[in-house]
Amino acid sequence: MTNFEAPEGSKKYRLKFLPAALEEWHSLDGSVKLTLKNLLQKRLENPHIPGAKLQGDLRNCYKIKLLKQGYRLVYQVEDDVLVVLVLAVAKREDMAVYHSAVGRLLSHP
């Protein structure tokens, strides 16, 4: 797992990526990455957004969606250690990003 500290300031949660999610992050286009980065910084202050809560196997996870670009970022909030853990980042095509997130969630200790 890779850690990214929140920018200096009053951020409460730290950001971490699963290794596969970090690879996906690094492969993103610069403009998509910048948009997601800005949204993630806001989520580090308040990660529990009711409208972004997922269901089913991902019921303890949340999403950030970029409608125009078609990307989704799926994360889990670990309140006990104040961490936002990114599980997957990809296009929504065929729900692949959600399937990846479920698989990674099941294999994550």
Sequence positions of predicted segments:
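Residues that form or immediately flank small-molecule/cofactor binding pockets and catalytic motifs
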Residues: 20, 59, 91
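A short, surface-exposed loop/turn module that caps and links secondary-structure elements
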Residues: 41-66
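Short, intrinsically disordered, mixed-charge
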Residues: 30, 41-45, 107
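Amphipathic alpha-helical interface surfaces
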Residues: 32, 36, 40, 50, ...
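Arg/Lys-rich, positively charged N-terminal/basic patches that mediate binding to nucleic acids
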Residues: 1-39
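Enriched for short, Lys/Arg-rich terminal
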Residues: 1-8, 12, 68-72, 76-109
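Conserved catalytic core of Hanks-type protein kinase domains
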Residues: 27, 43, 76
